[in-house]
């Protein structure tokens, strides 16, 4: 099994999202000891945003880099995405990655019956820290967007691990992280006993 681990938080060692995504990957390693993990830090090694030049792919090095991103995605069976909520949505570095994998003829196609995803059969686990509380979905453009774009690519096995309200106070941050990690542990226990 191949697992692609992406982090997109700009907070480095202070990132709750990075702690959560690492915990999800570790959980997958325990469940599947043979897993082959690839890691990409979209903050430290950002993918260029789409421009007229990157779309034209006139630079052979740029075209090769874009193809490497695509192949890494296509070869993954499981994708763990560290996606913090920034201003109600996702980091622009993660959006740049999505723009490189959402390619007509590669991960989706247009048919007489409408668009059809070509990247099905993958499992995506999204680890996310949010500064506030988003029980009211009208302010959450992150989760619906990720579900929509991944679904458009044919991926329907999508789950979220969330720590909310991490900006409220240090205690709330610690409690939210502990709760999210405990939820992972409960999920793991359920999987083992099933």
Curated annotation (Swiss-Prot):
EC number(s) recorded for this UniProt protein: 1.6.5.-, 1.7.1.17
Stored HAMAP family: Azoreductase_type1
Oligomer and partners: Homodimer.
Domain of life the protein comes from: Bacteria
EC category name: oxidoreductase
Record field: catalytic activity: 2 a quinone + NADH + H(+) = 2 a 1,4-benzosemiquinone + NAD(+); N,N-dimethyl-1,4-phenylenediamine + anthranilate + 2 NAD(+) = 2-(4-dimethylaminophenyl)diazenylbenzoate + 2 NADH + 2 H(+)
Binding site for FMN: 9, 85-88
Pfam families reported in the protein's UniProt record: Flavodoxin_2
Family statement drawn from the similarity comment of this UniProt entry: Belongs to the azoreductase type 1 family.
Taxonomic classification: Bacteria, Pseudomonadati, Pseudomonadota, Gammaproteobacteria, Lysobacterales
Cofactor requirements of the protein: FMN
Protein name: FMN-dependent NADH:quinone oxidoreductase 1
Gene Ontology MF terms in the entry: electron transfer activity; FMN binding; oxidoreductase activity, acting on NAD(P)H as acceptor; oxidoreductase activity, acting on NAD(P)H, quinone or similar compound as acceptor
Keywords annotated in UniProt: Flavoprotein, FMN, NAD, Oxidoreductase
Record has Flavoprotein as a keyword: yes
Function as written in the Swiss-Prot or TrEMBL entry: Quinone reductase that provides resistance to thiol-specific stress caused by electrophilic quinones. Also exhibits azoreductase activity. Catalyzes the reductive cleavage of the azo bond in aromatic azo compounds to the corresponding amines.
